[in-house]
């Protein structure tokens, strides 16, 4: 009888320990986003801003449609436009790191150069908003980078996120709003979790013109809009 009680007690202890460890793992290793979950959601992400000619109009559309987005900023541009950065933040959007200079040859010259660029961009956000973030997007994405560059970012404690859909506003010069909409609609290929790449750098008026249609399409498809 005593042995049975001991065995039961040990099993209960082991179960509790496993649950505790699993909970710790979930907390420490929570992904930026996860695919394969049941609810459909979309993350609108804007790179290369802020700009005077695009970002305020993007913000107007987002406000009108009642959705939030994530802005991967260029530090050099943010230094010149702190009021736009403050507006993005006050509107409830996420502000995260893209690059300080966005000069590929310069920032990808070495791991040290890349980290210096990231830290400079982070410092700009902190100086304007008092905001610290560890979320980053490689200019051009991480897909074709040397592994040592990706590794150095992870070792420095930054999380990075790419995208799995794009409106292709940086790929197709002069693309019409309808072309951008079709790309944003078709490239996700029925994914339940969509990280959509758009740009709010200078002279992206067609991106602004396509945005409302993109948002309304995904609302009709039952997607929830989230920030990273």
Question: Which residues does each PLM region occupy?
Answer:
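Terminal accessory/targeting
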Residues: 1-44, 60-69, 191-228
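Short, mixed-charge, low-aromatic patches
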Residues: 12-18, 38-43, 73-79, 135-142, ...
């Amino acid at each position: 009888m005593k042995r049975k009680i001991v065995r039961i007690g040990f099993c209960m202890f082991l179960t509790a320990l496993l649950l505790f460890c699993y909970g710790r793992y979930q907390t420490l290793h929570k992904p930026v986003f996860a695919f394969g979950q049941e609810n459909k959601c979309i993350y609108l992400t804007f790179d290369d801003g802020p700009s005077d000619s695009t970002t305020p109009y993007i913000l107007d559309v987002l406000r009108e449609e009642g959705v939030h987005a994530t802005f991967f900023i260029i530090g050099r541009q943010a230094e010149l436009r702190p009021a736009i950065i403050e507006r993005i933040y006050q509107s409830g959007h996420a502000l995260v790191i893209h690059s300080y200079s966005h000069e590929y040859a310069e920032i990808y010259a070495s791991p040290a150069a890349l980290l210096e660029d990231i830290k400079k961009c982070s410092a700009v956000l902190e100086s304007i908003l008092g905001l610290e973030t560890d979320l980053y997007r490689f200019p051009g994405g991480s897909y074709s980078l040397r592994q040592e560059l990706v590794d150095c970012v992870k070792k420095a404690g930054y999380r990075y996120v790419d995208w799995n859909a794009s409106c292709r506003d940086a790929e197709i010069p002069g693309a019409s709003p309808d072309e951008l909409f079709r790309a944003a609609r078709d490239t996700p290929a029925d994914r339940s979790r969509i990280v959509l790449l758009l740009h709010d750098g200078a002279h992206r008026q067609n991106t602004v013109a396509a945005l409302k249609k993109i948002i309304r399409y995904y609302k009709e498809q039952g997607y929830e809009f989230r920030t990273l």
